[in-house]
């Protein structure tokens, strides 16, 4: 299991300051919508200047018609990131088109599909998708697996089931990890590190418990000890 640190601070400068404090740790860095829209490709380059060995997960959750998603995926290749994601609800045709397009490249990033956002509760999710989170997450994961993707974004509660219906090597990345029982904020389906580990999660994403800490490096050290 690997740790991915969410770079969700209000400014580029604050994110870079955080990265500087944790530069000696073997962790992934997650660049989300706000940070990428605000700071762009230059931010990705600045990360590599601090530590060229950092691996970057570009969390943009692509969702569009198949050709547009595939075009965007090709553009992401040029950014040199190590992982990005799409929405599974865009459908199998869109996901397949993304993977077919990426076959042109000798080296491509890991591609994950978002199943159910961890901010959803059962009631909200059911009104939109007409089914339970667990059933729909399994279906989305199966669609992603059959479309040739490398894994999915899901909560820790769906990870074991998804691996059972796909493959043990099919990756799961879980946001909403609260390693020391912190407030869950706007996340609904949260878990701790031990639960994620027992669910055979491949990547855990931790944000607020790290960047809100006075000593983020120490928090990372403690999380890595649990991993």
From Swiss-Prot:
Pathway: Pyrimidine metabolism; UMP biosynthesis via de novo pathway; UMP from orotate: step 2/2. GO terms for biological process: 'de novo' pyrimidine nucleobase biosynthetic process; 'de novo' UMP biosynthetic process. Pfam families: OMPdecase (PF00215). Substrate binds at residues 8, 30, 59-68, 118, 178, 187, 207-208. One of its GO terms (cellular component) is cytosol. One of its GO terms (molecular function) is orotidine-5'-phosphate decarboxylase activity. It catalyses: orotidine 5'-phosphate + H(+) = UMP + CO2. Keywords: Decarboxylase, Lyase, Pyrimidine biosynthesis. Its EC number is 4.1.1.23. The active site is at residue 61. Homodimer. Catalyzes the decarboxylation of orotidine 5'-monophosphate (OMP) to uridine 5'-monophosphate (UMP). PANTHER family: OROTIDINE 5'-PHOSPHATE DECARBOXYLASE. Belongs to the OMP decarboxylase family. Type 1 subfamily. This is Orotidine 5'-phosphate decarboxylase. It comes from Sulfurimonas denitrificans (strain ATCC 33889 / DSM 1251).
């Amino acid at each position: 299991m690997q740790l991915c640190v969410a770079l969700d601070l209000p400014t580029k400068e604050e994110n870079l300051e955080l990265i500087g404090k944790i530069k000696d740790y073997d962790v992934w860095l997650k660049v989300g919508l706000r940070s990428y829209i605000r700071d762009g490709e230059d931010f990705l380059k600045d990360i590599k200047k601090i530590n060229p060995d950092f691996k970057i997960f570009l969390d943009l959750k692509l969702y569009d018609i198949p050709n547009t998603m595939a075009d965007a995926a090709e553009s992401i290749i040029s950014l040199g990131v190590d992982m990005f994601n799409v929405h599974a609800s865009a459908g199998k045709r869109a996901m397949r088109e993304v993977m077919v397009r990426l076959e042109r490249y000798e080296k491509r990033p890991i591609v994950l599909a978002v199943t159910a956002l961890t901010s959803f509760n059962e009631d909200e999710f059911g009104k939109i998708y007409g089914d339970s989170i667990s059933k729909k997450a399994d279906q989305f994961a199966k669609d992603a697996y059959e479309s040739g993707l490398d894994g999915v974004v899901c909560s820790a509660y769906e990870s074991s089931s998804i691996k059972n219906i796909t493959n043990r090597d099919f990756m799961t990345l879980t946001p909403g990890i609260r390693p020391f029982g912190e407030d869950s904020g706007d996340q609904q389906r949260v878990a701790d590190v031990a639960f994620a580990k027992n669910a055979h999660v491949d990547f855990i994403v931790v944000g607020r418990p790290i960047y809100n800490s006075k000593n983020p490096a120490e928090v990372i050290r403690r999380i890595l000890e649990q991993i």
